[in-house]
């Protein structure tokens, strides 16, 4: 009855029975709100409703909102795993009234749910109200029957909520649960309020004022209600535990990590299991909502979360990537409530696994440096910020990960020195950046907009138009006139020229007046609506207020239209072949080709690429009309239109639909529906043909395809056909047998390479092709030291050579370095069995690696390998090893 899933359902069902519209959780990446890193409260999706910018058909709503607090102002990351109630990911249950009911009904509903639906004892509950909120205090007495001592008045900002310096605001009323006097802590407002005895389980916000300025506050005409209850907190209360990590959901996740690692969640290992369970939730949900690990913004916060969990997996002794193995347990627990987890399972799994594999490569080395530096310190000391920065810059250790490692040792980090090192790096990067060469700063366009207004775009309906010059910019300054030969920027009251945005590049063409001709090389969109036309005056003089003719390069525009429409078809085809986790991560639409970046954890196979291409071309061959509609953004998304997470959209958006309508869930839905402000073909057949020419990696979890359309695609395929015929003739075979012929030649080549390599190995051991420039075997203090520098030997064959060398000398040290064609050096060192108690091959190979410019090395005491980029320093490396042996 009291499982997390049942509690969530009970809450939503209760408010649905009481006239509330049940709405889905909004994404963790807030839509249309650049001020927030992540959705961190239930009211975020209703922010514009509360401020009056939007209106909904319903007046009452209820949600179970997924939230993340791990970046910026709301950052719980450092405390997660070490306290009973801190999480990076949590669920916020809420009920909302938009000018419908107010304090009395909000208080009644909350008390009714807690005491009748959840059956909490009344004597275990107490509430707080804002000090001057007599109405709320009296309503609590009337509805709950609580005595005055259990209705606590609080004067601090904790009981007064505001959206910002201005905007809706109002007093709060918080509901607390008393865990009993066996747990330390006092009621809210007391000296002991930070204890764990009294836990806030629900916050009711009475939005009744509008803050106009610091000094002025007025009543709202339609007061509203915003409430929030942490699901994990109420679950702990209803399940009779005092710690959120003891509820059923976390017991399942922690049990899964215990089973895989073989380490019980006891003693020093409790925090690690908790960190992994919590961070798995935030990582999985962020990836499902389109965030991928990167080195900036939201992606960097995700990477910090993931790497913190991976470091704790390392503490548990996990030898293989762990988090992806826990994903099935998470989906089993939360997949029904949040189907996006199921849809994105493969993307989440692969992203977790790849990130952990990458980080493991540097984790050991970074921890080695950290242990070495911290060994010089004692409890209470500070780690040098420069060392912390090196860990960040070289080994990928976020600052909070370094702080987390040092926490148990009682050592902190000199954060000021770290910040200075970070700023120094940024300044150096800025100094090396040459800039774009543009003289005009962005601020000038806001000045232009304030003076002449925005530009009306006519390009959806026409490629020719008349207009009036409203502003001229030359050499970074606003001017009244430009003359023949000058590079300039023209702004007009209206234009058919498309300004670069949404991945589609800007139009080019001609602007002409009675006394001038201006070549437009590019068009850009600035300052939320000012279209700027960049180019050169070919003849005459252009002046402010001149009437002009604007003519877009139609041939170029036609190619751009085809490539943009093809991008939409490829996006949908990618989703159908690879899965619904595919989302757009970037694009470039030019006349020559299109480029599309998308979320996917691994390379796309040739077979998958063919399916994607065939699907897109099927829609091209349908030759159906491409439709565009203007509609409300919420309506468009409810009809299935794809929107980009984090993209800011106006209240009214342009929806582009392509492909014959299909029956889906009783509704007819076009094959592709996207929110898009770009220019498109009139019919899908106008695209002509789509051909994917390449697929590659952009970054972790992001792939890229490039494609051609129309005549460019046909020309490319014709050239490919000619090339295949020429290669077939060269290999004296037919085009149909070309693949088999190439495979045969590759097999022959591999056979000859093996034979040649075997001969080379024999010659090396016989001393016929060494290039060490010194004696191959030297006696050092009675120890035989054999070394060889060889070329054209594969690194994997060095071990066999070293083994043979050990047999040849009987007792001693053998070292080989091979130099590849690109100049890199690979080294292997062997120590005969009789000397491994005195000499370790790993220590010896690291001497070679340091000189070769590498980092460390690995292996066993009798055989180890390493490498480095400076193969030309092989002789120096051997000299360093010889010097070490002479001193040993």
Curated annotation (Swiss-Prot):
Cofactor note (record): Binds 1 zinc ion per subunit.
Cofactor: Zn(2+)
BP GO annotations: alanyl-tRNA aminoacylation; negative regulation of DNA-templated transcription
Residues holding Zn(2+): 564, 568, 676, 680
CC terms in the record's Gene Ontology section: cytosol
Presence of the UniProt keyword Cytoplasm in the record: yes
Disulfide bridge partners, by residue number: none
Chief site of localization: cytoplasm
EC number: 6.1.1.7
Family matches, as SUPFAM superfamilies: Class II aaRS and biotin synthetases, Putative anticodon-binding domain of alanyl-tRNA synthetase (AlaRS), ThrRS/AlaRS common domain, Translation proteins
Catalysed reactions listed for this entry: tRNA(Ala) + L-alanine + ATP = L-alanyl-tRNA(Ala) + AMP + diphosphate
Key words of the record: Aminoacyl-tRNA synthetase, ATP-binding, Cytoplasm, Ligase, Metal-binding, Nucleotide-binding, Protein biosynthesis, RNA-binding, tRNA-binding, Zinc
Primary role: Catalyzes the attachment of alanine to tRNA(Ala) in a two-step reaction: alanine is first activated by ATP to form Ala-AMP and then transferred to the acceptor end of tRNA(Ala). Also edits incorrectly charged Ser-tRNA(Ala) and Gly-tRNA(Ala) via its editing domain.
The family this protein is said to belong to: Belongs to the class-II aminoacyl-tRNA synthetase family.
Protein name per the record: Alanine--tRNA ligase
Organism annotation: Bartonella tribocorum (strain CIP 105476 / IBS 506)
């Amino acid at each position: 009855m009291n499982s997390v899933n049942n509690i969530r359902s009970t809450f939503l069902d209760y408010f649905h029975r009481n006239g509330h519209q049940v709405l889905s959780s909004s994404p963790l990446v807030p839509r249309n709100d650049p001020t927030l890193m992540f959705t961190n409260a239930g009211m975020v999706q209703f922010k514009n409703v509360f401020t009056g910018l939007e209106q909904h058909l319903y007046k009452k709503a209820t949600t179970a909102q997924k939230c993340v607090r791990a970046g910026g102002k709301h950052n719980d990351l450092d405390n997660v795993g070490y306290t009973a109630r801190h999480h990076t990911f949590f669920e916020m249950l809420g009920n909302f009234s938009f000018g419908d009911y107010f304090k009395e009904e909000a208080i009644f509903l909350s008390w009714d749910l807690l005491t009748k639906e959840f059956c909490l004892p009344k004597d275990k509950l107490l509430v707080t109200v804002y000090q001057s909120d007599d109405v709320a205090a009296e309503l609590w007495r009337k509805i709950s029957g609580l005595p005055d001592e259990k209705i606590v008045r609080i004067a601090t900002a904790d009981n007064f909520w505001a959206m910002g310096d201005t905007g809706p605001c109002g007093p709060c009323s918080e509901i607390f649960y008393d865990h009993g006097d066996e747990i330390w802590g006092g009621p809210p407002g007391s000296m002991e309020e930070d204890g764990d005895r009294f836990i806030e389980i629900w916050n009711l916000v009475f939005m009744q004022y509008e803050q106009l300025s610091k000094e002025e506050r007025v009543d709202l005409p339609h007061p509203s209600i915003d409430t929030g209850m942490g699901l994990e907190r109420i679950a702990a209360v209803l399940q009779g535990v005092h710690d959120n990590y003891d509820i059923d959901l976390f017991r399942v996740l922690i049990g899964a990590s215990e089973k895989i690692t073989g380490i019980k969640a006891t003693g020093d290992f409790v925090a690690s299991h908790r960190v992994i369970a919590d961070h798995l939730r935030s990582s999985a949900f962020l990836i499902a909502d389109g965030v991928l690990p990167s080195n900036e913004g939201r992606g960097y916060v995700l990477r910090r979360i993931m790497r913190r969990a991976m470091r704790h997996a390392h503490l548990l002794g996990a030898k293989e990537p762990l988090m992806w193995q826990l994903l099935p347990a998470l989906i089993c627990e939360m997949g029904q409530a949040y189907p996006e987890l199921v849809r994105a399972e493969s993307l989440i799994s692969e992203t977790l696994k790849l990130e952990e594999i990458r980080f493991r490569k540097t984790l050991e080395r970074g921890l080695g440096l950290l242990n070495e530096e911290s060994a010089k310190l004692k409890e209470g000391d500070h780690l040098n910020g420069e060392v912390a920065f090196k860990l960040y810059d070289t080994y990928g250790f976020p600052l909070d990960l370094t702080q987390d490692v040092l926490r148990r040792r009682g050592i902190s980090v000199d954060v000021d020195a770290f910040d200075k090192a970070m700023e120094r790096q940024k300044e150096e990067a800025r100094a090396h950046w040459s800039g774009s060469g543009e003289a005009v700063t962005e601020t000038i366009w806001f000045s232009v907009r304030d003076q002449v207004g925005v530009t009306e775009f006519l390009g959806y309906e026409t490629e020719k138009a008349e207009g009036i010059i409203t502003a001229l910019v030359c050499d970074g300054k606003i001017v009244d006139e430009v003359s023949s030969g000058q590079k300039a920027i023209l702004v007009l009251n209206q234009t058919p020229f498309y300004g670069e945005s949404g991945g589609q590049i800007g139009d080019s063409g001609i602007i002409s007046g009675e006394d001038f001709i201006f070549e437009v090389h590019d068009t850009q969109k600035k300052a939320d609506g000012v279209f700027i036309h960049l180019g050169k005056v070919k003849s005459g003089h252009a002046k402010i207020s001149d009437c002009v003719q604007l003519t877009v390069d139609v041939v170029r525009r036609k190619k751009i239209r085809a490539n943009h429409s093809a991008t939409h078809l490829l996006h949908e085809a990618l989703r159908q072949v690879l899965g619904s986790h595919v989302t757009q991560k970037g694009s470039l639409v030019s006349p020559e080709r299109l480029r599309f970046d998308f979320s996917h954890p691994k390379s796309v196979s040739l077979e998958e690429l063919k399916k994607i291409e065939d699907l897109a071309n099927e829609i091209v061959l349908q030759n159906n009309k491409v439709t565009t509609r203007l509609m409300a953004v919420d309506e468009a998304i409810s009809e299935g239109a794809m929107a980009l997470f984090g993209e800011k959209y106006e209240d009214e958006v342009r929806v582009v639909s392509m492909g014959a309508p299909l029956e889906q869930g009783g509704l007819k839905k076009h094959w592709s529906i996207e929110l898009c402000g770009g220019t498109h073909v009139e019919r899908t057949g106008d695209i002509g043909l789509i051909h994917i020419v390449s697929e590659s990696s952009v970054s972790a979890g992001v792939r890229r395809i490039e494609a051609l359309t129309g005549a460019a695609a046909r020309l490319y395929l014709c050239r490919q056909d000619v090339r295949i015929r020429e290669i077939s003739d060269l290999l004296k075979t037919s085009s149909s047998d070309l693949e088999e012929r190439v495979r045969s030649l590759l097999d022959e080549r591999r056979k000859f390479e093996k034979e040649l390599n075997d001969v080379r190995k024999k010659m090396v051991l016989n001393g016929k092709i060494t290039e060490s420039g010194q004696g191959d075997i030297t006696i050092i203090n009675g120890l035989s030291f054999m070394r060889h520098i060889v070329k054209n030997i594969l690194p994997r064959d060095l071990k066999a050579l070293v083994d043979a060398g050990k047999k040849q000398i009987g007792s001693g040290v053998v070292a080989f370095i091979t130099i590849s064609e690109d100049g890199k050096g690979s080294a292997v060192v062997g120590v005969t069995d009789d000397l491994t108690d005195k000499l370790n091959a790993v220590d010896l190979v690291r001497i070679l690696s340091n000189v070769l410019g590498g980092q460390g090395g690995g292996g066993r005491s009798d055989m180890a390998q390493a490498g480095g980029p400076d193969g030309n320093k092989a002789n120096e490396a051997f000299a360093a090893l010889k010097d070490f042996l002479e001193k040993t």
